[in-house]
A protein has these predicted regions:
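Long, distal/terminal scaffolding or interaction modules
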Residues: 1-87
Length: 87
């Protein structure tokens, strides 16, 4: 997947979940690049803000969108990496 595809999928997911995507283009591009880098290195778009352990059973939880993002958005208004935001 290239960066445009990752961004497109992220936007589609956000729309489906009634979230928004970070409006700060610089931060958004930083996160998308991090997702792409992790895909190239590990084969999955792991959240660039979380630690990859090498134990896939554990690490699968941090494939974007990670299992934690909905609770984080509810609590803070955004996920840890600030890709997804509450509207």
């Amino acid at each position: 997947m290239n960066e445009k595809q990752i961004l497109k999928l992220s936007r589609q997911y956000a729309k489906k979940q009634d979230f928004s995507i970070n409006k700060d283009k610089k931060h958004l591009n930083f996160i998308i690049k991090g997702l792409k880098k992790n895909e190239e290195k590990y084969g999955y778009i792991f959240c660039p803000c979380r630690i990859i352990t090498g134990d896939f059973d554990n690490d699968r939880k941090i494939i974007c969108p990670c299992v934690y993002h909905k609770k984080e958005i509810k609590k803070w208004g955004h996920c840890l990496c600030k890709l997804f935001w509450r509207k």
